[in-house]
Regions:
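Nucleotide/phosphate-binding catalytic cleft detector across ATP-hydrolyzing
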Residues: 1-34, 50-165
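Gly/Ser/Thr-rich loops at beta-strand to alpha-helix junctions
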Residues: 41-44, 129-130
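Short, basic and Ser/Thr-rich N-terminal targeting/leader segments
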Residues: 39-41, 118
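Short beta-strand scaffold segments in enzyme catalytic cores
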Residues: 36, 43-48
Length: 165
């Protein structure tokens, strides 16, 4: 446990340090139930109860990884640089829209597990957060540097050894 967060993973040591730090940062910013989303190379969506228990979460390929996977593993699809559209009318727009909708859908499905709890909120960070945050229909707080906020909180909460000398 650290800074009010307890690790509920089946094997606590398997939780990545970046996810742990993001959970600690989220707890520092919000005391209620939260879905902690970090959108980068991978997208993580982690559930944090109001009492600080990390219940588990999901890891999925990030937006760019999805785009590259489609381009690299299909015969006819390009590396898409299209735009989101409610009704895409080009292949590149359809690819981008599909990848962004997949991200938003995964986040919303995870959030549904806590949506009925008072004060439930999604805290979202990461370089790709801005690409699909506007597609989400849930209480959302964008946070720059959530992992760094968590690391700073961890450092303050960790007893320091006495100075030598």
């Amino acid at each position: 446990a650290c800074a009010g967060v307890r690790n509920g993973y089946a094997v606590p040591g398997q939780l990545g340090a970046d996810r742990w730090a993001a959970l600690i940062g989220a707890r520092r910013l919000h005391s209620g139930p939260a879905l902690v989303v970090c959108a980068g190379t991978a997208t993580t969506a982690d559930l944090l109860d109001a009492d600080g228990l990390f219940r588990g979460g999901a890891i999925l390929p990030g937006v760019d990884l999805m785009l590259r996977a489609l381009a690299g593993n299909t015969a006819q699809l390009p590396l898409a640089d299209g735009h989101f559209s409610d009704a895409p009318r080009s292949t590149v727009d359809a690819i981008v829209t599909g990848c962004l909708q997949a991200q938003a859908g995964a986040v919303e499905r995870m959030f549904a597990q806590i949506a009925d709890r008072p004060g439930a909120r999604c805290l979202m960070s990461g370089g790709a957060a801005g690409r699909f945050a506007d597609l989400l229909h849930l209480p959302l707080q964008r946070v720059d540097n959530l992992v760094l906020i968590g690391l700073a909180t961890f450092a303050r909460a960790t007893p320091q050894p006495p100075a030598m000398g």
